[in-house]
């Protein structure tokens, strides 16, 4: 029989009051409206004129853009964090959907800025990047320029941005909701998917086995739907990559990570060429666990003494103390 040890965190929920008091907080709507108005004003002031800006003027523009984005980021993060605590609350989901749509509208107002920076002549861009006034944003400017071969025209970028609301982001949210709704029946108790997954780290092998079987059973219903959602997200990315002209499916990620396709491929080759290391590791782990052969539910089994149980209050003090 699986027993869940109380930690003191059973009724603990995120305190999001540093962002907003609630979904009805008037400050939330004020911030959204301010962001919308500021984005429109930003476009009115700078659209078509980025190439004419001095280093100081470009710094002012970047700072204003950061201010606009930081205000809206606070609102959208609040909505997502609040929704993550209860994905069955339709009101919370509606707030996420509304702000996601508003975010796309704001992005279409601001996206010209990056496009015009990317379009600067190399000599002018290099001079701006080298200026002391833009030292803080030097890496960001170089990153924007690095993506120059893969950006589309502004009308095309606007279409992709607005379509993303009903495209990738919508499918991604649906997948999270489907996964979050899964309940696992373990030893007569119904628990959440994440809690059930945590049982796979138990030192009790029989509990790991029962948990694994229960998780497999719970994942059965809706499997085809989740697979379809996942595949749709993958296809959406492949279309985006094709339109932008990326060489491989991972090229955009490599570029964002400041690395190259060649470097990542070398890493992949090094790992796949030494699968024997993983085999040796699991052989050793089986021996340390006193087993002739590992089962799939033994992969995350702890080694050594039983894991230390830490109460919520102690864990909270430990983490907060680390940031003091």
Feature locations, PLM:
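A well-structured
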Residues: 1-323
